[in-house]
Amino acid sequence: MRLPIFLDTDPGIDDAVAIAAAIFAPELDLQLMTTVAGNVSVEKTTRNALQLLHFWNAEIPLAQGAAVPLVRAPRDAASVHGESGMAGYDFVEHNRKPLGIPALLAIRDALMRAPEPVTLVAIGPLTNIALLLSQCPECKPYIRRLVIMGGSAGRGNCTPNAEFNIAADPEAAACVFRSGIEIVMCGLDVTNQAILTPDYLSTLPQLNRTGKMLHALFSHYRSGSMQSGLRMHDLCAIAWLVRPDLFTLKPCFVAVETQGEFTSGTTVVDIDGCLGKPANVQVALDLDVKGFQQWVAEVLALAS
């Protein structure tokens, strides 16, 4: 039986790969997509998500979400993904539009209609998820678990300690981590290992139309290089759903720093139990890199 999922995203070049896997992995049933401001503005992430759905002729409803963090001024990652968020490929024109309700209500309504609890996957800042949990607490029993790409047990990628998706809205992440729902965190500890090699990248133009499109996007992606390999951060959240055997997880207490002058956005991961607090997150700490690369090749071959 396919696993029903809702995907909250901020495309973003590596988001595009994760969306492809969510659509084409035969084990998954992608039922709803929502967008959030993150890599670029929410208007751009929504446009990019609609372009991808049209490219794959995927009839999946999409709702636009939060334009700004809960408290802070927005920050973006245009230096990594380009000003549009998906520079490098000319998508054809289309007339698709997002749903007429915001992401918060789209997720709430879809959860309440679902015949069984649904897995939420968040690969951008956690603003939409925090709004859902705080404004619609009646939805909690309908959430099977939340799988996120975000955080780190060690160093960061936008500050010395903080990973971008958490740092973009620390207050939202803190709300989510305190919520009591089951959380799997695929952070930089594994995503920095999730590298597509130059040899594989060079085969993409011959793979299929998705390979050609991704190869064009990758030429503008700044999380690594085509010569040294590219890190597929967001794809790890989808990979865990399909191949959890590739990941080493440890239950840990995780808190989000929201006050520190130099540490705001840091996920404080208590690996050794020093704080004596109960674990609230399953933290991915290691990855079978070869197995991950093989799985990526298999799923992208299906993305025609």
Curated annotation (Swiss-Prot):
Annotated GO biological processes are: purine nucleobase metabolic process; purine nucleoside catabolic process; pyrimidine nucleobase metabolic process
Query: Which Pfam families does this chain map to?
Result: IU_nuc_hydro (PF01156)
Q: What class of enzyme is it?
A: hydrolase
**Which terms in the Gene Ontology molecular function aspect does this entry carry?**
purine nucleosidase activity; uridine nucleosidase activity
InterPro entries assigned to the protein according to its UniProt record, in alphabetical order: I/U_nuclsd_hydro_CS, Inosine/uridine_hydrolase_dom, IUNH, Nucleosid_hydro_RihC_nonspecif, Ribo_hydro-like
Q: Which UniProt keywords apply?
A: Glycosidase, Hydrolase
Mention any one GO cellular component term assigned to this protein in its UniProt record: cytosol
What is known about what this protein does?
Hydrolyzes both purine and pyrimidine ribonucleosides with a broad-substrate specificity.
What protein is this chain from? Non-specific ribonucleoside hydrolase RihC
Q: Which organism is it from?
A: Escherichia coli (strain SE11)
Q: Which gene encodes it?
A: rihC
